Amino acid sequence: MTDSPATAKIAVAAATYWVDRPFDYRIPPALADKVVPGVRVVVPFGGGNRRTEGIVLSLGTAQSGMRLKSIASVLDASPVLSPEMIRLAVWLRERYFCTVYDAVHAMLPAGLWYQMESVYTLCAGFDRESAYAAAGKSAQEQLVLDAVFAHGGSCPLVDLERLFENVSPARALQSLVRKGVLETDSREKRRVGDKKIRMVSLTVSAEDALLAADRREKRAPLQSACLRLLCTLDRVSFSELCYFTGASSSSVNALVKAGLAEITQDEVFRRSVLRSEEQSPLPVLNEEQRAAFEGILSLYDGEHASASLLYGVTGSGKTSVYVHLIDAMRRKGKASILLVPEIALTPQMIRIFSSYFGDDIAVLHSSLAVGERYDEWKRIKTGRARVVIGTRSAVFAPCSDLGLIIMDEEQEYTYKSENSPRYHARDAAKFRCASSNALLVLGSATPDVESRYRAEKGVYHLFTLKNRFNARQLPSVRIVDMRQELRGGNGSEVSGVLLHELRENISRGEQSILFLNRRGAASLVACGECGYTYSCPHCSVNLTWHSVTRRLVCHHCGYTRALDDACPECGGLLNQFGTGTQKLEEHLREALPDVEILRMDADSVSPAGSHEKILSQFREKKVPILIGTQMVTKGLDFENVTLVGVISADQLLYCGDYRAGERCFSLITQVVGRSGRGAKPGRAIIQTFTPQNPVIGMASRQDYEGFYAEEIELRRLQNCPPFSDIVTVTVSAEDESSVLRCCTYIRDRIRSELRGRKDAAVLGPAPLPVVRVSNRYRYRVTLHCRFDKEIRTLVSGLLIQCNTAKEYKGVLVFADYNPME
C-alpha cells in the first residue's frame, strides 16, 4: 500500500468571491520541503490551467481517487504570513465578504506582490529564416518576430503590446502559436527586490595588507591606498572605497584577484524617514496619566487579551501614556503597534517616539516608496523594529510577540477601508490582540459612540484624563452667526470677527489654523443668465473648480476639463459658487496681502513627503496661517497656535448620515483642541448659519458627556449601532433598470428569509448620495440586524447568486458590514 500524496489547501488570487474556497493541490516531491503554510506558490487554475498566485493555508493528504493539479513553483523562501495572520485572513473573508486572497493582499506590502507576466518564446527547431517563412506576408506577425529576436528569442507580452501601440498583437500571436512558431508561458515578476550593496573587506590580516600596500606604493598607488583604507575601516562599501581613494573598479578587482580582498553583497534597508539621533528620557507623567498608565498595564498578564478606552480631553497628554505603555512592552520583549488615522500625523509621531525609542521604530503608510515600505516590513518581520507606527494597514504589521496595539483618535472613519476587503482596523486589532493575548488601547478626546457604550457596559475598561496637561485651560470658544454677517453686508466665507482675530494673532507673532472640509476653489460653476452648470459626463455630480490647476474636476471619477471663457449654452457670464480651501486661501491672500499662508489638503499633499514638508514649514518658520481639510483637525501639536477657525460647521452637520452629528462634534472638538496647547491661552471661532444647533453648542463647550447622552438615546430610537448592526448590499451597473430589478430581488429575498426575526429591518432599494459614478448607477439595500451566522450566510449566498446569474449580467453586487457612510 502506497502513502497518500501530500496536498496543500491554497487560497488562489484568481478566484472571485463567488468561487472562492481553499483549493486542494498536490505537492510535488521536489517541493515537499518548501511548501509550508504561509508561503506563496504558483498553481494552474481554471479550465485553461492559467498560472496564478496562491498562498498555502494548510497541509494534508489526498483522499484515494482524488485527481489533483500540482503546485508549479514556490515563490517564497520562508512564510510571508504567520498562522495567526492566515486565521485573520480567513476571518476577514467571513466578516467582510471578500476573498481570502483579497485579505492576504491587504496584509502584504506592494514590494512583495508578484505579477504573472506572459512570455512568448521561439519554439525549438525554428531559426530566423524558418520563422519568418512561417509568418508569410503578415506584417504584424513579422513585427512580432522582430521583437522576439530582438529580445534574444523570448519576449514579454507587455513589450509586444507597447510595440503595437493602439493595435492589439493578439491575433498575430495566436497565429504564430497555432503554427508552432511560438510557445507561450508565464513567469512571476516581483515589483521590487531586495536592495544590495557591494562591500569590500580584507581576506588577509592587517599586517599582511600593509606589507602588500608598501609593495604596491609605486607601481599601483591606488591599490595601495585601497589597502590602507581597508586596514583602517575593516569593511567599506565598494562605492565609498573608490570615492575616498580615487580608485577605479579595476583597482579593487585587482586586489580581489590577488586574494587580498573580497567583495560581498550586503542587504541594506531603504529608509527616507528622518529620526531623532538624541535619546530623551521618558516624559514625566502627572497623577491622572500615571493612574491611566498603571491601570492599563495591570491588565496585561500575557495569558488573556484586554481592551481599554483611554478618554482624555484634547491636550491631556494621551501620547505620553502611549510612550510609557510601549516602553513597558519593550522591557517585556514585546512588540507594539501605534495606529494613527492620517498620514499627516505620522511625521509628528515619528519625531516624538524616535526621541525615546530610536531605531527600534518602523513606519508603514501608503506615502512611502514601494521599496521603503517593503524594507520596513522586513525590519518588523525579522524583529529589527519592535515599535510600528502607521495608518490603517499597519494593523497587519508582521510583529512576532505582539503585546500592544494602540489606536489613536479611534473614532475616525479613516480606519474603515472603502475597498475590498472593507475591514475596520479596530476589528482587525481586536482579532490580533485576542490571538496574541495582547492589550488593545483605544484613545480619543471624542470616543466613538459605540466604543463609549461598550466601556459603559464593561466590555472595555475605561480610563479618563479629565484635565489638560500642566493644568492648561481649554480654548475659549465663540460661535459666530453667519446670518448676521450676511445682513451686515459681508458675503464672504470669513466673518469680520475671524478676520479681526487673525490680524491680532499675526501682530503678536502667533499662529492660526483654519479648517474647511472641502478642497478646491468652487463647488459649482454656473451661468448667471441661463442657469447652465458644469456636470461630470460620467457621474451625477457637478464639477469642482480648482484655481491652482485652472481645471474643472470630478472628485469621484477624476474627469477633468478646461473652463470656458463664457457659457457654452448662451455665451453668458459664468459665476462660481461655494467655497473650498483654494478659494479660502485666495480670499485671505487678498485680505492679508503680506502674510504667508500654507494650505494642506488632498491637492497640496499628493507628492510623497508633502505632509511632512508643510508641517515642518509651519512649525519651524512660524508661518502665520495654515488652512486645511480634516488633515489639520487632529493630533497636531503646535505650541504657538493660539487661534483656530471653523469656517463652516454646517457643512459637517447636514449630510444625511446617522453618524453626521457624531462626526461634526468630533471634528469641531478636535480642531478646537489644536489651540492653546502651549503656555499661551487659546481661542476658537466657529462659523455657522445654525448657531442654535445643540451639536455645535456642545462641541463649542467640549461637552462630550452631554453629547454622548443625547446621541446614544437617538441611536437607541433609530436602532442603529451599537444597538444593532448594519449590513448594506450595493448594486451597480450601467443600466439603471437592471440595478433596480436586482435590488428589489435582494430586498424581497431578505425579507422572506428573515420573516420571523424581530431584530431585522430591511430598507430600500435607495440610491446612493451620488447615484451615478463612472457611468454606473448605484443603489443599496440596507439591513438593520444582529450580524450573526444566519445573516452572513444569507448575504453571502445572495452575492454569489446575483454576481453569477445570467439575468443580472453586467451587474456588480457587493456587501459591507457597518459601513461608515
Residue ranges and their predicted role:
Residues S737-S752:
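Extracytoplasmic/periplasmic
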Residues M1-S444, E456-R472, K789-E821:
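Accessory, non-ATPase domains that flank or precede helicase/AAA+ motor cores in DNA-metabolism machines
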